Structures are given as C-alpha cells and as structure tokens.
Amino acid sequence: MKSIIITGGAGFIGSHVVRLFVNKYPDYRIINVDKLTYAGNLANLKDIEEKSNYRFVKADICDFDAMYALMQEEQVTGIIHLAAESHVDRSIKDPFTFARTNVMGTLSLLQAAKLYWEALPEKYEGKRFYHISTDEVYGALEMTHPEGIEPPFSTQASSEHHEAYGEDFFVETTKYNPHSPYSASKASSDHFVRAFHDTYGM
C-alpha cells in the first residue's frame, strides 16, 4: 500500500484534497498532517474519519524530527504540501510566523523527504513531492483590455487577442513579483522546492 502525506489537510482546500484521495484511492494510505491553527477544522472531515485508509496526525511541519519519523513509520512515497499561513493581513502584522511556517516548514519537509528517500535502495524513483503555491507570488494583474470588453477565459484566446486584451492571465513565464510578507514567504518556498529538484533530483 502506498502512503501519502497531505499537509494542511484540515484546511478548506486541504480537506477537499484529503477527502478526494481517501475516497478515490482506497488502496492508498492517506496521512493528514495538520497543526490545527485558526485555519484548520477536523469537522470538515467527519465523513471520512473512520475510513481504514485514513489517518490524522496533529503535528507542526517545522518539527523536522516528527516529520522524518512519520515518513519512516508510514513508508511515505508521496507528499502533497498544502500547509501554509495564508492570510495576507496577518502576514503584515506577523511576518515572522509566515516565514517560519511557509519557508522553514517547507524546508523541513523537503529535507526529511530527501534524507528518507535517498536512503532507500530505489532512492527517488516513484517518489513525488507536490508543492501547492499561490498566484500571490506573481503580484497583481493589470487589466489592459478596452473598457466594457470582457477578457477571454482561455490562454489561447488571450494569445490570439493579446493586442486588445493585454496580460490578463498569469502564465508559466510570468515573473515573480511578491509584495506582501505572505507572498514573499510563498515565493521563497517555491524556490526551495525547485532547488531541491535541481540539486538533488527530487
């Protein structure tokens, strides 16, 4: 049985992801790791808490030892990382907490996964680390289409009518342009994930 850790699984988006995986993949063991801060609510998952392939672990992703031990215990093959401080206004009042959770928490998970997976005979083969980011890392879009004309709703349409509509979509080549402590912390975590891929092959 494959085991997948989903961090932040008691949050709004995370709980939907956890429920989807628990119900869609009964042969997978789904481990929901959440610190249960103001954004987490286990009531979101009442309908699946008794499922045999589901486990909840209350833990802080910044706790490297706990994350490493959990990966060893569950023989984790995949991580879907949604846990994050995500309230822009809160980040302005308390940027340190956002840097700790979003940057150091992500780094803690990456390092734990790296050390666990690279010690296996097959190393990273068949292992995946999925990092969920935010469009906030790109800053704000400037709507440059003529007043009264709605922008297209596909990147193909945007490309075909670029002169009329301008840059109405974030695309793969959009440059990072974070402005708040929240978006800066998420941009930093994005770069760490890419660095671990490029440096270690994760």
Residue ranges and their predicted role:
Residues M1-M202:
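N-terminal Rossmann-like NAD(P)+-binding domain of SDR-like oxidoreductases, especially those catalyzing
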